[in-house]
């Protein structure tokens, strides 16, 4: 089973969309293997988005991500990375397919409801950034 990282961004948290977004993930067959609510510091946001540090939108992205609490999740399931990206929709909510998270809850390219890992390799790095191994459960393991 694959795992991927998802972040419910400050705009979705402040508008009380957490439950709806979690339901979308679970109804699609993805399981929640870890979850925490936190308010990112400037340093944490800069570290997480370090790969974008040379891009013109970097500071605006960091400022947005520290503007309020976020919910950080590890999602687990078959093809978790690609499934999560399909559920999220295009980065620009105006271009996102109807019914996707960003089409429903996003406002703009910068204020677009959720983040999701783009590759399995990046998912592993991003998960390790926010969670220790002991915090991530095997969500696909059947209960005894």
From Swiss-Prot:
Superkingdom to which the source organism belongs: Bacteria
A family per Pfam: NDK
EC number(s) stated in the UniProt entry for this protein: 2.7.4.6
Subcellular location: Cytoplasm
GO cellular component assignments: cytoplasm
InterPro entries reported in the protein's UniProt record: NDK-like_dom, NDK-like_dom_sf, Nucleoside_diP_kinase
Keywords: ATP-binding, Cytoplasm, Kinase, Magnesium, Metal-binding, Nucleotide metabolism, Nucleotide-binding, Phosphoprotein, Transferase
Protein name: Nucleoside diphosphate kinase
Native source organism of the sequence: Chlamydia pneumoniae
């Amino acid at each position: 089973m694959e795992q991927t990282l998802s972040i419910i961004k400050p705009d979705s948290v402040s508008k009380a969309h957490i439950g709806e977004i979690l339901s979308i993930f679970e109804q699609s067959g993805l399981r929640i293997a870890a979850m925490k609510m936190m308010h990112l510091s400037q340093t944490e946001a800069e570290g997480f988005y370090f790969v974008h540090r040379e891009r013109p939108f970097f500071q605006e992205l960091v400022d947005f991500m520290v503007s309020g609490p976020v919910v950080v999740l590890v999602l687990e399931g078959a093809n978790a990375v690609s499934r999560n990206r399909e559920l999220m929709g295009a980065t620009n909510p105006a271009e996102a397919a109807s019914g996707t998270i960003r089409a429903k809850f996003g406002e703009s390219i910068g204020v677009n409801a959720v983040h999701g890992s783009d590759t399995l390799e990046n998912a592993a790095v991003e998960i390790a950034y926010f969670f220790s191994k002991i915090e991530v459960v095997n969500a696909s393991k059947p209960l005894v």
